[in-house]
Amino acid sequence: MSLLLAQAAVNDANIHFDKLYSYRIPAELAGRVFPGSMVLVPFGRGSKARMAVVLAVGEVDESDAPKGLKTLYDAAPEDARLTPDLLELVRFLKERTFCTWFEAVKAVIPYGAQYRPAVVDGRHVMQSRLTRSTERLYTLAGALPEKPKPGPRQLAAVAALQNGPLTARQLDEVGISRATLDGLVKKGVLTAAEQDKAIDLFAAIPFDPQPLELSPEQQQAFNDLLPNLEDARPHAALLHGVTGSGKTIVFLRLIQRTLELGRRALVLVPEISLTPQMIRRLKSTFGSRLAVQHSALNNTERLLQWRMIQQGNADIVVGTRSAVFAPLQNLGLIIMDEEQEHTYQSESAPRFDAHDVAKKRAVMENALLLFASATPLTETYHAAESGKLQLVQLTHRYGGRPLPSVDFIDMRAELAAGNPREVSVRLARELQENLDNGEQSILLLNRRGYRTIGMCTTCGHVLKCPNCSVPLVYHKPQQALLSHHCGHTVHPLPQTCPECGGKISYSGFGTQRVEEELAELLPGARILRMDQDSTSRKDAHETMLAQFARHEYDILLGTQMVAKGLDFEKVTLVGVLGIDSLLFGQGFRAYESVFSLITQVVGRGGRAALPGRALIQTSVPDHPVLQLAAAQDYKGFYREEITFRRFSLYPPFCSFVVVGFIGDQEGAVFIAAQRFGALLGQHAAQKPNIPLRILGPAPMNITMLNNKFRYKLTLKCRNDAAFRALLHETLDAYDAEKLPQKASVILDFNSDGDL
């Protein structure tokens, strides 16, 4: 006699128990359990109910069945099953990031689509984490009987449904009650079914398609990309265009052609702040078969959008990093806009890079993957130069508009002249000029808060978070010190030193402080501050950007969320403040990040008929990175950067992997990192064909976070299957070590040098 078995990965299993377990499928579940099914299983001592995902199903002779075989408790409905494509992405994440099976599962499906264990009438069952919001859909199924004579409401209902199914809500709006409809169902005139309640997130955006008129250069870019879009094989390309060159209209034309081919499109953006403008362009051009996926949606909205995609009711999906897992079928085009942004990398398990997942999906779907940026990653441009990606260029601004002129303001001279403010005299003057002319300005300061450091004037003690090794930041509206890493709050604001009783002086500046200065310097100016603090409310990004577009504000002051992708025709002045701290930041990408940030924000100016200009405040105006960014000279920067990367052995000439160690005792964490490094070296010595350099152990940039000490090993390697197998061997050997205190191990395969 044969048994039907499921191989399942169990939720909440730690890394040592994260493997596939065999379970018997009972007869009552035989037709409901398949690869990708979410199931409820007994696990461990006491057979505690746990969620699991099925990876494989097969038959085995009863005599060959594993001893102690347990039986599945329950299985989720079919619509909760992971498609084969999503299941393949789960396997990909598990293999590439060393996460657990269920960490990968939770990455590819939204919270609302997940289930939890419950007990009903003494039985272990699965319950949805969200109450499903449904509505009744009525469909015409037959003719009205002549007798008894139908009433006017019944006739109206049948007439309304002649053109297709309608919901109870839609019919109620024209005066047809639920009682009338249910009466017609009983007569067999209508059929009724429950469907997910529709939420039109874009109802306020009209469908107003305009001709997609391309410039000759844009048309050439489209023509160059078209053969790979129409080819039924996977392809990848880089669209490198200067700021304002009109990359978006090329996107729209490619999406239009994708839909004509009967396929679907996925558009990724790095920031939630960029989704409103992209959604507006897509909805107005292509209509309502559009879905969105990002973290600003509540759980219900995200689930309904996900189900809309899953059920094939969306042709285009736009969203941030997590949208790369959208369950689109027949995917023909993936666009990754502003592909250089670090936000495409996840900072929690599974620590994936959306670039890698997008490449995997393009191969799985035989799709075109298009990276796009004015300042692409050095690795991406190198791949294009090397012929691994198709390189398509847009070298001119749309409409022949010039790039903004750029000047530097030497803040050393400002200080010497007696200006104590963070806003220079010239920047204030030019902001006033814009106000007088009815034009708008954007100011970038990538530092939130009011004051960034509190220090004792007597002993020099710096006020730091007790849970983290970072200074606390003064936030004036709350009159409190906040940790931007763990959220620790100190209130009321300390005025005396906890070490010696001396006076605390607050210095440094953030967006709140500059907002206050601008109000003092420019009375009557309407200033909109856009940072993590001011955009915490739902729909805040969309609301603020719409207000600025309507010229309800004169100055947009913000962090990096205002630096890229935004297009406002009245913005003619861009100011950059506080860039020096980023220029001398840690990590091998510091120069690349600064070049990109300045190039992008400068490109926000002069995008319509009015010419643009930019002012960069710095104490190092002659720095070559700033000079190249001011000139919008990406190729010049790339030549310098690729030379540095080659000489120093940084990506793309190697992979850069960080192994992090986290624990309660600093000494124990250091010893754990040291021992892991020794074990890795020993195993690597037996495999001389695997290139590897081990650096460290060393403290991470933030040595303590959430009361945990943090050390790291940095590995320069070739991240292939052989290297990952070596890491697995080392992890197994480390787990077998008898250390007095072990540290948690975290791996990041996409690091710039820290976690």
Where are these regions (language model features)?
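A carboxyl-terminal module marker
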Residues: 678, 682-705, 709, 745-755
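Short secondary-structure junctions
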Residues: 14, 522-525, 680-693, 737-742
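Accessory, non-ATPase domains that flank or precede helicase/AAA+ motor cores in DNA-metabolism machines
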Residues: 1-370, 380, 385-401, 683, ...
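Long hydrophobic segments that form regular secondary structure
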Residues: 674-676
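A general secondary-structure signal for short beta-strands and their flanking turns/coil
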Residues: 3-5, 18, 47, 438, ...
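Inter-lobe coupling/hinge segments of SF2-like helicase ATPases
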Residues: 209-215, 219, 232-670, 682, ...
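Solvent-exposed, membrane-proximal periplasmic/extracellular interface segments of envelope transport
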Residues: 64-75, 698-700, 704-716
